[in-house]
Amino acid sequence: MSRLFLEDGESVPVTAVSVCGNFVAGIKTKDKNGYNALLISKTEKSNNLNKSKSEFFKKINLNPGSLSEFKSDEIENYEIGKHLTAEVFEVGQYVDVTGTSKGKGYAGVIKRHNFSMQDATHGNSLAHRAHGSIGQCQTPGRVWKGKKMSGHMGNVKKTIQSLKIVDMDVENNVIYIKGAVPGFNGSELKIKPSNKK
């Protein structure tokens, strides 16, 4: 993350996100597909493209990349092969950002679910960071689904809603989003207009 200073001197924490290399790879219409949507390709190097995907990109004359679909009713101004730049966004707009969170490995309940530790003394033997009871008795005789326990932490799909675009560099196709976004440096993100703003 970085920070920007606004005109009134306020320091705002921002994440710089590059939006270059995005092309329209397909257009879905209500008549043909039942809904309106844009299929966007993010150009990336790949040595293991399957044949159907490589033929798809060859047919539309685009470099191969990852595909994402975005529902939109404003599809008239787009055509296959059009390069999407930072100009599709605007300063002050609120967006929802989806990405894969950083993987933390195997974690206990204190780190993973914010449990409290047990007593350090008073008869506690080797259970200081244990989660304690995980259920009842013979009824129901099982552990409920969704029980908070230790396990793999992170590396899951996460969406952060209503993040504000505070600035943009159209020349370099970079937008500056207020706050943090999921994932590590250089990871792929999906950005769309906010549902709640």
Predicted region positions:
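Extended basic (Lys/Arg/His-rich) segments that typically form rRNA-contacting surfaces
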Residues: 1-197
